[in-house]
Amino acid sequence: PPRARWNEGWDENVKDKETGEIKLVHHPALKHVKENVGTQLNKALEAIEDANVDALQDVLKGINFNRKIGQRTLDDDTLADFVLNFEKIPLKDDDFEFPDLLGSAYEWLIKFFADSAGKKAGEFYTPAEVVRICVEICDPKEDMSIYDPTAGSGGMLIQTRDYLREHGGDPGELSLNGQEKIGTTWSICKMNMLLHGISHADIR
């Protein structure tokens, strides 16, 4: 969507509050934004979600770059540097060593924050080794429907997919379903699924 474009600026018709006249306002490309960066990033995420409702509904709009961290919000310079650093990282599919690289990086971050959170991590994270044992016990097959009533960050469902693929099965023939009552954890789970290339999972 135009509002989320990285390299291209975009134009918007805006109504003047005082005169009522319609004016054409030019917005810079996202990587060139220097003022109100947090607000522009929030709007970019909203635009991406609105353009991909089936996959991203309620996933990105909860992210707020203007939220206080400790006693302050991140300033424009910090956020602008954060945005520009993304340009230094090759993020095209062809640049990845393996298809699930982004998903693996995301899971590493989940584990990192889980280790830092201590007991609170139990709300969204189960160690991968424990999950693997559970999956092996279940021994999923094609045409099965898998349901995780406490999905957390989605590790069980992802490892179920991986297990089937490792054993020569077609993950597309597996029905993945999960439930999570904590909103932020649900968003983490949805994003984890998408970054692992799983768009057909039903997470509620």
What is the meaning of each model-derived region?
Residues P1-E142, R204:
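Non-catalytic, mostly N-terminal accessory regions of nucleic-acid modification and defense proteins
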